[in-house]
Amino acid sequence: MSMNSAQIRDAFLNYFAERGHEKVPSASMIPGNDPTLLFTNAGMVPFKDVFLGTDKRRYDKATSAQRCLRAGGKHNDLENVGYTARHHTFFEMMGNFSFGDYFKKQAIQYAWDFLTKELKLPAEKLWVTVFTEDDEAYDIWVKDIGVPEDRISRIGEKDNFWSMGDTGPCGPCSEVFYDHGEEVWGGPPGTPEEDGDRYIEIWNLVFMQYNRQADGTLEPLPDPSIDTGMGLERISAIMQNVHSNYEIDLFQALIKAAAEIIGTNDLDNKSLRVIADHIRSCSFLITDGVMPSNEGRGYVLRRIIRRAVRHGHLLGAKDTFFFRLVDELARQMGEAYPELEQKKQIIKDALEREEQQFARTLERGLAILSDEIGELKGNVIPGDVVFKLYDTYGFPVDLTADIAREQELTIDEQGFEQAMSEQRQRAQQASQFGMDYNQQLKSDNKTAFTGYDDVVGQAKVVELFKDGKPVEQLQAGENGIVVLSETPFYAESGGQIGDKGVLVANGPAFEVTDTQYIGKAIAHHGVAKAAVKLSDSVKAEIDSERRENIKRNHSATHLLHAALRNLLGEHVTQKGSLVEADKMRFDFSHFEPVTTEQLAQLEREVNAQVRANLPLQTQLMAIDEAKEAGAMALFGEKYDEQVRVVRMGDFSMELCGGTHVKATGDIGLFRITSEGGIASGVRRIEVVTGEAAVRYTQQQQSVLQQIAGELKTEPSSVAEKVQQLQHKFRELERKNEQLQQKLAQQAGGGLIAQAVDINGVKAIIAELDQADPKSLRGLVDDLKNQMGSGIVLLGTANGDKVSLIAGVTTDLTSKVKAGDIVNQAANVVGGKGGGRPDMAQAGGSLPEQLNEALATATTWLQQQL
């Protein structure tokens, strides 16, 4: 029975939902619970904490179709995509999971039942593998399911034993393969011919029943779990009776759409496969909040986009094409993933911008690479060439490697890495940044934070550091770190800077100049005003006025974030922030400058919420509950099971551990001071609030009044007055240029008479007194036309700058070139130049040498002609 991809996905999810499994929507491809992973690359990743026992869900069995990506780090399929039948950057992993509910027997029965009854695959076409030592699974397959022993293979630990890491949950696997029949080459799993295409793995069942200890021993888990995975693309190929995933309905629709957009009829071309695969990964990455950039996930996205664009170029694409595939992708997958349809325009805009940006350098980079390959002595493209393409023309390394492979060449990866390393060293030397001192310190203490409600608190000194080492006492005047049993001091985190203040014993004992985390301990950095010893009782007092200003700015970031999403779109996500006492800055994903009018709208919107005096409410809740309620979480941040939700009326709701005002009215006033780009796809807005915003407004008003006074007009008319002055200035510039041209023409009339003969060639070599450099070019052309055949070299000095222009009539360019002439003179005045054979110009910085420069050029011409 043939089924399309959507039908198979629905059948799988419904099958397990009908058997008591929670149908869990696909999580983001940006893992929220694992900072070690660049992307979600398996169906179990969103459940990792459940398997580890650090999280508990309201259900004990689940099913999902998880969006996955393999294009960076350890799991990197990028170079094979399009060239093999089953490699993809993006794929859907369907799975069923048990968290201590059912185990091995039920999992095997579910898999067999779904394959043979729901999908109606012939039992005789299925082949099974088990771990060599897993007799239990072997017996279930043979005795309970009835699989013949000659269609079961026992496989070793490398392929049939799964581990989450060197230690932790692990267990044996059992895999189900589909047999395409004798007409396809290949052998059963475990045989020397297993890499053939006859037997294709379709489902992997992982039985997590052990906990691997540090010494390698396996201890049985009290609640064994099940993790299974079946690739939608692979099972679709089998159900549609094709041997390549690219032949299934979903890919064929994308391939045909790409061919039509580009204008090619060769539907079997590998470049179309690459493009069809890459539009899926790129679109879903943007859906999940990733934008093209030069680092991290953003750079992986950029690499994939540029690889697709280059393959479009191979097919003859002359215009931007890649973004136009988003419509077809939304038609194919929008029902299963509504977010794709919702963010369609954002995806298209981001892809089109990136494609346009790369198009500016693609042709030039390809030409340079072609020249280098043409001059290549061996079969390895040098690392410095690969680096130049990367650094100057935006060619990702794997893109250059792709091109090399097509011509049976390789790249010098070691040489490239060496060039990259040298560049990084240069950047580090320029930045002058050192190691974070806190990273060198260790503390086993966990400080209780009391600062949400209090600005003063009693505590005991539990740890002291001096020069990075634990001590029992700090003497007066010594710099150090104090760790307390509890504290109202907020340690820098989440973009909010640490508190300042004082620790008091019998008078001020320790001035706190900064507060940071050391592990889970809150570290008070500063200088002792009196002796401080372990176990001392102190009163911790924060600088409450400074804290109030920080609270205003932090609450303002939440209002700004919500206002940005309302105004610009839901693609806006926080990329970073810095909340200080006197100002704050907010970095966010957006692909173009925020206009002046939009900035004004943002100010109006945020100040409206300030005037509304919305109450600020905080609540601790489960992370899943918070997300379901609509609380914004930052991509890539790791959150505890219990999170703090900060709500400002119905306008803003975010996960946040920082300190905030009691109501938005406490912010007072919100003013944006600047907006700009800090990286590709990332913008920054800087803001002041409260008293600082009042001072900023007054300063602006004062400057405006001063300008109005200078212009002798009212403040409301300043813009109009400036426009009038600009118009007058441009008119004067135009008249001045006309006058300079007339003066140059008059000077030119006299210059013709000064033409000298150099070995039968007429030449005009002269200095003009403070002539406009722009007018010299036209004058040289006029002189060449009047001479008919000849050479012109003119120089002028304006202040400390020298301008030189040389011209040669076309009949003489085979004998002497304008660029050579002008450089002879430029060398003398401390400059250089260049241009065409018939016209060239140069600059210099030694006006006192101009006469000598012209004489040098004359002597050189006498030698050349």
From Swiss-Prot:
Keywords assigned: Aminoacyl-tRNA synthetase, ATP-binding, Cytoplasm, Ligase, Metal-binding, Nucleotide-binding, Protein biosynthesis, RNA-binding, tRNA-binding, Zinc
Annotated HAMAP family: Ala_tRNA_synth_B
Catalysed reaction equations from the record: tRNA(Ala) + L-alanine + ATP = L-alanyl-tRNA(Ala) + AMP + diphosphate
Name listed for the protein in its UniProt record: Alanine--tRNA ligase
MF annotations from Gene Ontology: alanine-tRNA ligase activity; aminoacyl-tRNA deacylase activity; ATP binding; tRNA binding; zinc ion binding
Record bears the keyword Electron transport: no
SUPFAM superfamilies, A to Z: Class II aaRS and biotin synthetases, Putative anticodon-binding domain of alanyl-tRNA synthetase (AlaRS), ThrRS/AlaRS common domain, Translation proteins
Gene this chain is encoded by: alaS
Species this protein is from: Idiomarina loihiensis (strain ATCC BAA-735 / DSM 15497 / L2-TR)
InterPro entries linked: aa-tRNA-synth_II/BPL/LPL (IPR045864), Ala-tRNA-lgiase_IIc (IPR002318), Ala-tRNA-ligase_IIc_anticod-bd (IPR018162), Ala-tRNA-synth_IIc_core (IPR018165), Ala-tRNA-synth_IIc_N (IPR018164), Ala-tRNA_ligase (IPR050058), Ala_tRNA_ligase_euk/bac (IPR023033), DHHA1_dom (IPR003156)
Domain topic, free-text comment: Consists of three domains; the N-terminal catalytic domain, the editing domain and the C-terminal C-Ala domain. The editing domain removes incorrectly charged amino acids, while the C-Ala domain, along with tRNA(Ala), serves as a bridge to cooperatively bring together the editing and aminoacylation centers thus stimulating deacylation of misacylated tRNAs.
A GO CC term assigned to this protein in UniProt: cytosol
